[in-house]
Amino acid sequence: MRLSYSRAWVGCCAVALAVIAGAAVLSSATKKTAFTPRDKAYYADQNTINFVRPGLKITIVSAKIAADGTLSVDYKLTDQDGLGLDRLGVTTPGAISPSFLVAYIPTGQTQFVSYVTRQRTSTDGKITVTQATGDTGGVQTQVADGEYLYTYATKLPKTYDPAATHRVGMYGSRNLTEFDLGTNYASAVFDWVPAGGKPTPREVIKTVSCDKCHDQLSFHGGSRRGLELCIMCHQPQTSEASAGQTVDMKVMAHKIHMGSQLPSVVAGGKYAIGSTDWSTVVLPSDPRRCAECHESTTGAAQANAWYTNPSRAACGACHDNVNFATGLNHVNLPQVDDNGCASCHIPKGELELDASIQGAHILPQESATAPGIVINLVKVDNGAAGKLPTITFTLKDKAGKPIDPATLVTSPNKISFVLVGPTTDYGNTTFAGVTTPGYVSEAAAALSKCGQDGTCTYTMTHAIPAGAKGSFAIGVEARRALVVLPGTVKQVSTQYGVDNKVIYFSVDGSPVVKRRAVVDTAKCNQCHVRLSLHGENRNQTEYCVFCHNPSNTSGTVSGINFAVMVHSIHFGDNLATAGTTYKIGTADFSDVRYPAFSNTGRPGDTTNCQMCHLPGTEAVFPIGMNPVKAPNLLMDPAPATTAACAACHTTRSNMAHMAAQTDPKFGESCDVCHDVNGQFSVIKEHAGK
């Protein structure tokens, strides 16, 4: 890659190179450990790395309050290796403009209050609100290379409480686009008690919990990162001006994540902050799964606050049809304050689905009363071309007790086996007597034969095609009905499924080859918690691809090959930019807002392939893969790599490029440029930091 440096940088090279030579020469090994394939700097040549020293880290060393209320903070600006950076961008490229916050938690309270606020008025002049904000006009002093002292312009009041927990926060950016290295962002917080002692900051959720779905929690242009910084302003003190509603984190976050399921939205209203409408948000998991955000394993100091400290603000954010003043939708019990909440809403009661916090948020299909269903596939006999394969499997409940398959005959109970192959590429094998593209599914409950130990056999009624070659696979799905709290006013009828299992076998005596693994169900469940579809039947990506293969479509509307479908659904509302949509039957996924945040702080960023992909699988397909039926794409059928990429890259110019690189005789030439080691490898082109 050839870089063109500005005249300003050519003029100061002598100074810069002297500094760099003495302090910042990095080895190739250091480069690889300092950056990831998600970073633009990972792909820069070593000379550029040595010269620019990309990256930005902010470290707050200390904070002090003088007798007259003057606040100062000692901080460091460093690159990825911890070497100091020039704030002004003279001796190291990229000027840095840090911003500063300060807040405290009043004694006896639990949320931050900012010392610095501003007033904002709505455009019609009818609403004026208070907002926490950052300090401006302070004085910067350099202490050492990369170390600075900032003295706030805002003085703390004489009545400030030195025994209270205080927090200073910083955020900033470093623009390195001149070197094709993007913009680096960073933030930091520092807690202390001015009078001495251990601070007790608010810590209900840690950023690591947010990042499971959001990848990198960042807002307001990208530099404000991490929940620890967010809650300094997003607390009860702050409201947005357009409608005067609070942007307190516990209210705002609950409402955004509840989104389309808010009672007020279901009733026809909307939830918006300024001009951004969050009413279409569909949480990737069930919003009753409070513990997926409120994780007890992260070390958050108040991780259990969600069930030990209920409040009208937090609970009413999701349950926004409750009127606490009148008691409407609250069993006619008005609540003038939060003092009585925990009297009824205890952490956990004796029964599921009761008024306790944890009980009320249980998903019926995950009830502890469910006996469970566990299936293991043991072996396949008679699995040769032209034969009827017999599957040996175990069928038990979670306590290890055998399940009679006769109890699974009547819907919604079931057990079914699906046969598919070859594993090199599903979707093009024709099974006699069925119209399903590339696979055959059989209900097995009535014909399964089981012993007293729960070991069963089932013989498929459809044969493996006579000319079949290579490896085939058989997968299982099963489901049981469940009634929770039968005979009570809380009775709920539901169903739950087994974890799909897959077994591979050779139909021609050749070595068994499993189907390629591209994504990992565990990665899906980082966001979806339990990816379970089609009536609690299908929950493992290894099994999903049986049916979601290159030959399968949703009528004449869309291709449902797994790569096309998942890319299209996750790309969601980005499709509108290209003037396209993605539908499966009547379900329109064009308003899906992917939860990952871009480097500039906006949701809908789909560039981090490894949020779903296994390492190294975000790559072009080998030559010779089956074409993909995809009515939603401009090319139908589409070559394998084209189909996967065009699900996101949907424009006509994108498609023209892909078509031009596909020869009718020799196929796609994507690997020439986009292979793992290509100049424009897939992962390199998706690097966004």
Residue map of PLM features:
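Low-complexity, acidic Ser/Thr/Pro/Gly-rich terminal tails and inter-domain linkers that flank the onset
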Residues: D45-A66, H361-A384
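Bacterial N-terminal signal peptides
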Residues: C12-G22
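Short metal-binding segments enriched for Cys and/or His
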Residues: S239-G244, F324-G327, E350, T553-V557, ...
